Amino acid sequence: MAHNVFCARYKQEMEGLDEPPFDSDFGHKIYNNVSKRAWGEWIEHQKMLLNEYRLQPWTPQAQEFLVEQMNQYFFGEGAQLPKEYVPPSPR
C-alpha cells in the first residue's frame, strides 16, 4: 500500500518513501514529511554538493555537512548552492 505524506518541500499530499532513508529520528522525520519526488531531487542535489565541494562521504565532517544541507533543503529555506557552481548547460 502506498505511503502518502504532506511533502515539506512541495506543500502538498504526495507519494512518500517506501522506508526511512536511515535509522534515526531525522530519517523518520524525512519518511513522514518528504515525498519520493523531493527525495529524488535531493539525491541529485547531494551529488552536486559531493562533487563541487569534493566531499568524501565516509568522513564525519562530510556527513554532518550533508545532514545540515538536507535539513535546510527540506525543512529550512533551501540548501545553498556553492558560490562558483555553474549548472550544466542543456544538451
From Swiss-Prot:
Gene3D superfamilies: Fe(II) trafficking protein YggX (1.10.3880.10). GO terms for biological process: cellular response to oxidative stress. GO terms for cellular component: cytosol. InterPro entries: Fe_traffick_prot_YggX, Fe_traffick_prot_YggX_sf. Keywords: Iron. The keyword Methyltransferase does not apply. Transmembrane segments: none annotated. GO terms for molecular function: iron ion binding. NCBIfam families: PRK05408.1 (NF003817). Belongs to the Fe(2+)-trafficking protein family. Could be a mediator in iron transactions between iron acquisition and iron-requiring processes, such as synthesis and/or repair of Fe-S clusters in biosynthetic enzymes. HAMAP family: Fe_traffic_YggX. This is Probable Fe(2+)-trafficking protein.
